C-alpha cells in the first residue's frame, strides 16, 4: 500500500488502527515486541525508499498508537489512543498527551478509533495549529462487533446497516466541519466471508465543509487519494472557542497546555 500510494503521487499515506499486527488482544498477543519493532523498521524503510510519509497503527510499548513516519523514514511521533474500549484494555493503557506535527510543511494531528467520539481530542490540536486530522480506526459497534457481523445469528438488513453506517460517516464529517479542517479516515475493510472479522471499511476523506470527497467501499481494501486544498482549512469554528467574549474560552486556553507541538521544542 505504501508503494502504491507513492506511485499514485501521494505525499502521505494513512493505514488503519493496529495495521501492523491486526486489531484485538488475540492478534496483538501473537506478535512479540521484537517482531513489532522489526515491522516498524520495515515500514520506515519503505517510506524512505518511496519518499512518502505514513501514519500507521501499532501496539507500542503498552499503548495503542499511531506511528507517524516522515518521507525520509525517520520517526516523527507516536500518538497514543486516549479513550480506550474493552478490546483495548488487555494490551494497552490510555495516552495522556495530544500532539501536533508537521508533514510536508503542513501541521497535522491524529486520533485513533474511539477517540472520534470526543470532539475535544480533535479541537485542541486544531487550536494548536493542525489543519489536517488523520483518523485511523478498526471501528466496531457498541457491542464490539463489526457492523456487518450477525447478532444472535441474524445479520442486519441493508436498510439497518445503511442507517448504522451513516452514524459513523456523520461523526467523521462532524469533526471536520465543526473545526473547518480536512479529515482523512483510514478504517479496516469488512470481511464478507467472515463478517466477525475486520470492520466496515468506508475509509474516506472529508473536506472542511463536511463533504465526503472520497470514500472506499465496505468490503474492499482500496487506496483512495485526494489533493487537499489547504486554503480551505481555516479552522474558523475552532478559533471561535478562543474568543475572549466566549464563556468557555478560558477553559480551552487552559486545556491547550495538554497539546505537545512536535518540532517546537
Regions found by a protein language model. Name each.
Residues 45, 60-170, 235-243:
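Active-site catalytic loop in hydrolytic enzyme cores
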Residues 3-6, 126:
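Non-catalytic positions within long, well-ordered alpha-helices that form the structural scaffold/packing
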Residues 5-32, 137:
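Short, conserved active-site loops that position catalytic residues or coordinate cofactors/metal ions
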Residues 231-265:
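A conserved C-terminal secondary-structure "cap"
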Amino acid at each position: 500500500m505504501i508503494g502504491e500510494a507513492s506511485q499514485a503521487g501521494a505525499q502521505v499515506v494513512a493505514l488503519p488502527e493496529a495495521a501492523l499486527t491486526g486489531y484485538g488482544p488475540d492478534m496483538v498477543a501473537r506478535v512479540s515486541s521484537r517482531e513489532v519493532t522489526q515491522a516498524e523498521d520495515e515500514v520506515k524503510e519503505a517510506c524512505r525508499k518511496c519518499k512518502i510519509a505514513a501514519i500507521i497503527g501499532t501496539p507500542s510499548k503498552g499503548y495503542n498508537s499511531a506511528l507517524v513516519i516522515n518521507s525520509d523514514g525517520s520517526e516523527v511521533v507516536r500518538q497514543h489512543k486516549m479513550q480506550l474500549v474493552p478490546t483495548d484494555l488487555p494490551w494497552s493503557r490510555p495516552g495522556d498527551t495530544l500532539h501536533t506535527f508537521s508533514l510536508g510543511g503542513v501541521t497535522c494531528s491524529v486520533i485513533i478509533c474511539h477517540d472520534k467520539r470526543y470532539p475535544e481530542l480533535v479541537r485542541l490540536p486544531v487550536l494548536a495549529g493542525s489543519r489536517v486530522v488523520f483518523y485511523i480506526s478498526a471501528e466496531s459497534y457498541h457491542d464490539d462487533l463489526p457492523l456487518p457481523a450477525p447478532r444472535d445469528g441474524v445479520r442486519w438488513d441493508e436498510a439497518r446497516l445503511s442507517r448504522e453506517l451513516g452514524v459513523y460517516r456523520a461523526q467523521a464529517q462532524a469533526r471536520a466541519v465543526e473545526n473547518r479542517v480536512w479529515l482523512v479516515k483510514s478504517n479496516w475493510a469488512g470481511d464478507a466471508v467472515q463478517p466477525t472479522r475486520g470492520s466496515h471499511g468506508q475509509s474516506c476523506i472529508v473536506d472542511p465543509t463536511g463533504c465526503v470527497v472520497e470514500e472506499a467501499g465496505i468490503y474492499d481494501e482500496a487506496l483512495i487519494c485526494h489533493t487537499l486544498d489547504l486554503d480551505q482549512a481555516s479552522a474558523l469554528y475552532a478559533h471561535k472557542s478562543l474568543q475572549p467574549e466566549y464563556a468557555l474560552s478560558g477553559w480551552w486556553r487552559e486545556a491547550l497546555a495538554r497539546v505537545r507541538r512536535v518540532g517546537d521544542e
